[in-house]
Design a protein with these regions (language model features):
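Catalytic-loop motifs flanking and including active-site residues across diverse enzymes
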Residues: 95, 133-134, 239, 283, ...
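ATP-binding N-lobe of GHMP and related small-molecule kinases
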Residues: 2-125, 139-151, 334-339
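Short, acidic Gly/Pro/Ser/Thr-rich loop/turn segments
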Residues: 39, 48, 77-79, 208-214, ...
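ATP-dependent small-molecule kinase catalytic core of the GHMP/sugar-kinase superfamily
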Residues: 153-281, 285-295, 299-301, 314-339
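Gly/Ser-rich oxyanion-binding loop with an adjacent helix/lid
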Residues: 6, 15, 108-194
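Residue-level signal for inorganic ion chemistry
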Residues: 70, 255, 306
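Short Gly/Ser/Thr- and Asp/Glu-enriched loop/turn motifs at secondary-structure junctions
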Residues: 304-310
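Short beta-strand scaffold segments in enzyme catalytic cores
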Residues: 39-42, 61, 68-72, 165-168, ...
């Protein structure tokens, strides 16, 4: 892993400059939408913190109309404005500072901008709202400045806002390759040409409030202190390859088992950190135990969990009625339904 200051903005700025024209001005107000995503094979740990490069590849499924709507237009005041879910945020807040820093990579004349984001899912609750938020912001900036960048470049740029944002530029299944180059130019996401209309996801809410520790802080703590982390990158890379193969084969049982094992291995690695890091709550384990009991009865349902307490169920349409009846607080998502 490359040890460099996390506040060193010169390196990301150079990466943006390589893809953006020297003369750049806001052409028009713009709006964009990006879906949130759930990783079926997860990344945890970075080989370069400044460039936001992962130690392992990952693969996700996007969440259709669960995501972020973002609008950008000139501000009516002399300074930037950042709005989230209808609330104007203090400019010194962590979220606003991240948005403004990202805007600064694009603009040249420092024209004050107003950014409005509305999430259709709980913010900071383990549902990757930062991923959809920065993906939508990247797409909106591409439109606002009339850049017409290809999606592989947009994916690389979105990475500087949130690693998982690289995967939220598309619907469906998306793979983010870790890349090998030191400059990160080969670390971007790509959509997989895999259509699976029967595929379902259900979000079982456990805690929809802010997490006690951000994913970024939790990741850094795990990498630095967990004795189990040394085996994670190689296993996670192998899991990503195997999940991809299971998808191509439409082998749902293998896909589900791999995704669940990958998530549990990640949480075990976090819980082995010193001091322990545990995002899961007692109700999370209750949901898992209910799911495992259902599987013993022949129901092909699997689980995955990101850095949060909520449990995501993976199943096919044949199990949808059972899931709705037995996990009655769950919200079922059909990723391949047309909007």
């Amino acid at each position: 892993m490359t040890e460099r200051s996390l506040t060193d903005s010169t390196i990301p700025a150079a990466c943006f400059a390589a893809h953006l024209p020297k003369r750049l001005s806001l052409c028009q107000p713009a709006a964009a939408y990006a879906p949130s995503n759930i990783a079926l094979a997860k990344y945890w740990g970075k080989r370069d913190y400044v460039l936001n490069l992962p130690l392992n590849s990952s693969l996700s499924i996007s969440l259709a109309d669960w995501g972020s709507h973002t609008q950008i237009f000139p501000a009516a005041t002399a300074c930037d404005e950042v709005w989230l879910n209808g609330v104007s945020l203090p400019l010194d807040s962590v979220f606003a500072q991240k948005i403004i820093s990202f805007l600064n990579f694009f603009r040249r004349d420092m024209l004050p901008l107003r950014v409005e984001t509305v999430n259709t899912l709980p913010t900071a609750a383990g549902l990757a709202s930062s991923a959809s938020g920065f993906a939508a912001l990247t797409l909106a900036l591409d439109k606002a400045f009339n850049l017409q960048l290809c999606h592989s470049v947009l994916s690389m740029l979105a990475r500087f806002g949130s690693g998982s944002a690289t995967r939220s530029l598309w619907h469906g299944f998306v793979r983010w390759d870790r890349g090998e180059k030191q400059d990160g130019s080969d670390s971007f996401a790509r959509p997989l040409a895999l259509d699976w209309p029967e595929f379902r996801i259900a979000i079982v809410p456990v805690d929809t409030g802010p997490k006690s520790r951000s994913s970024r802080d939790g990741m850094n703590h795990t990498v630095a202190t967990s004795p189990l982390f040394q085996t994670w990158p190689a296993q996670a890379e192998a899991d990503c390859t195997d999940v991809h193969r299971a998808l191509e084969a439409r082998d749902f049982a293998t896909l589900g088992a791999l995704s669940e094992a990958n998530a549990l291995a990640l949480h075990a690695t976090m819980m082995a950190a010193r001091p322990a890091l545990c995002y899961l709550k007692p109700q999370s384990w209750s949901v898992l135990e209910q799911l495992w009991a259902a599987r013993e009865e022949g129901h092909e349902i699997y689980a995955t969990m990101d850095a949060g307490a909520n449990v995501k169920l993976l199943f096919l349409s044949s199990e949808e009625s059972f899931v709705r009846h037995n996990f009655f607080t769950a919200s079922v998502i059909r990723p391949f339904d047309q909007p």
